[in-house]
Amino acid sequence: MAGAFRLPRGAYQRQYAWGLHETLDVAAMQAAADRLTGRHDFRAFGRSPRPGGHTVRNVQEVKVSGAGDWVTIAVAADAFLYGMVRRIAGALVDVGRRRQPLEWIDSLLGGSTTGLRLAPAQGLVQVAVEY
């Protein structure tokens, strides 16, 4: 994906960011994120951590928020597939760039992987694990 990896220099900005250098449509990204909430088969978004494991996951929330030049994507789920959050982020960014329509998210949930990109791992930060 286009973009540059930026390493913030400030002591309080030690988390990594995926720098895109373009404006994203945050409202479209949130509309796409809303389609991902609930219980779905996320096989297009990743693979099970166990061979033959199921790919159905319950996503409680996907929140896209923007402040100035920053856009944050937060995902909460009962469990994740390998690579799932990176693919969700990549899909939402493509919708935000207007490279894909909202309906594309529905096709991904239907199992299509056409056009699905993997966001770089550098921009991801695990915030919490709850049991």
Where are these regions (language model features)?
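Structured-RNA-binding interfaces characteristic of tRNA pseudouridine synthases
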Residues: M1-Y131
